[in-house]
Amino acid sequence: MDFFCYSYMVVILPTYLAKAAGMAASAAGLLAAAAFPAIGILGSMAGGILMSATGKRKPILAAGQALKLAGVLVLTLFLEQSLPAGIAGIIIFAVGNGMWMPVMYTMPMEMDGMDDNRVGAAFAFMSSCGFLMGFISPILGGGLTNIMMGMDPGQTTVLCHVFGLKWSLFLFGFTNIAALLCALRIEETGK
């Protein structure tokens, strides 16, 4: 599920920032490009440090998913009123997006009955599902944006596009609820 919302956000974020917040296209692109690698690194480091310090996996995985949901909500609900609030939403999402990775790459190695071959297959399966969702999400998101644009009649084309991007991203954010529920149900593999 992670790649589903993340891939859609990465695709639309520069346009959404430029149109909803009135940013220059180059500044919006730079912010979007820098946010996920730079802040995502901090989230990954935090996830790894917390995992090492606590020996737990599940709470960190769940916290990452909750942060991603919170980040999407803050971004979509506040960007048009406040660019700093929108940027805060991006940062919250990016931290959560990075936080889950150390956990998900550790858990398969700790599960009962796993050996080198099975761990490799688990990583391949997780990556394949992620890339598939990353391919599908912009296609579905574009269609959803077009549908949402039609729900905001009487506005300029730009405002309709902002409306469509905002609410399609808002809805995509709820995939993080499914990921959070899965994180809460998964068996703790840490000590």
Give, region by region, the residue ranges found by the protein language model:
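Extracytoplasmic gate region of multi-pass secondary transporters
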Residues: M1-G47, M101, S137-P138
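Short extramembrane helix-to-coil loop segments that connect adjacent transmembrane helices in Major
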Residues: L17-A27, D115, M151-D152, H161
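Transmembrane alpha-helical cores of Major Facilitator Superfamily
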Residues: A33-A34, A38, A66, A124-L132
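Helix-to-loop junctions at the C-terminal end of transmembrane segments
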Residues: G43-K56, T145
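C-terminal transmembrane helical hairpin of 12-TM major facilitator-type secondary transporters
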Residues: R57-M107
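Multi-pass alpha-helical transporter architecture, strongest
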Residues: T76, L165-K191
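A late C-terminal transmembrane helix in Major Facilitator Superfamily
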Residues: G113-M151
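A membrane-interface helix-boundary motif in multi-pass transporters
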Residues: G142-N176
